[in-house]
Amino acid sequence: ITTRLVGSEMCIRDRPYIARVAGKRTFPWRIMAVTAEDTQMPVNHLVYALAAPNRIGDYNWIKPGKVAWEWWNHWGIKGVDFEAGINNETYMHYIDFASRHGIEYVILDEGWAVNLKADLFQIVPEIDLKKLTAYARQKNVGLILWAGYHAFARDMEHVCKHYSEMGIKGFKIDFMDRDDQEMVDFHYRAAEIAAKYKLMVDFHGTYKPTGLNRTYPNVINYEAVHGLEQMKWSDIHTDQVTYDVTMPFIRMLAGPVDYTQGAMHNANKRCYHSSMDTPMSQGTRCRQLAEYVVFESCLLYTSP
């Protein structure tokens, strides 16, 4: 596959082959999992077991945990004496919340960098990232940065080195949205370079897991799911309740899932409606709590 940049989008042109390889080589396993009981399917680790072993050596620095997430409710915190939004005051509020409640991380989702420039070194003027990182360190909270795929890919060595030295703990990389040879190669390179600088990776907007989290244990999560964020814009014909009780037996067989469960606004299907500012789940609040137990995830989101 060849690519060319049109605006900020990758334009793909198909080739009459799946992948280009040189000489003899082995190829990844293809798996058919059979279990005696359906309850064994979500805890089947065949994909992980057949992946290439750890390539990064010691990984005691990798710390799974919970993460406070501001994008779910559009930075919509209330009862504060400052204007909530993409600014230091809002993120310090999230850091304080995380510190009080034993939440290990706060994520700075889309908006902290100048997105239209696709440049992770152009930070919006309302954010002083060095100050935030220092403040979070005092509170024993780690920061994770969202990054669009294109901005991360074009200078990932420099990006990883710079933000690791600042004290950032990892990246949530988004909008890959395909699984051709070029994109699979990107995932491997991103995992390898991030590990070099002791950064964790959450692959959002990605293809299904294939065991990369064994080869590079710093890959702690994958989206690749019709997750809760879809409720921000889905219509009433979406049956998320049925999907949620089916997904563990299908998608979770491949690996951990960045579902972002935990909605505290809840509705039955008849009352559900989409909302970017005050999103809701379909189903009950107890159902959302149960998903923390059922859905395997090394980075559990919470939205104060």
Positions of predicted regions on the chain:
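Glycine-rich, aromatic-lined ligand/substrate-binding cores of catalytic
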Residues: Y272-S303
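Propeptide (latency) domains of metzincin metalloproteases
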Residues: R4-E9, P16, R20-R25, T35, ...
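Active-site-adjacent substrate/metal-binding segments within catalytic domains
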Residues: I86-T90, I95-F97, Y105-V114
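An acidic-aromatic substrate-binding cleft motif
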Residues: F27-D38, H45-M92, H101
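Aromatic- and carboxylate-enriched substrate-binding clefts and catalytic-loop regions
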Residues: E110-M280
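Conserved hydrophobic/aromatic pocket- or pore-lining residues that grip, position, or stack substrates
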Residues: A68, A98, A136
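Glycine-rich, charged/polar anion/phosphate-binding loops
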Residues: D14-I18, D277-T278
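Single conserved hydrophobic/aromatic residue that forms the stacking wall/gate
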Residues: I1-G7, I12, Y301-P304
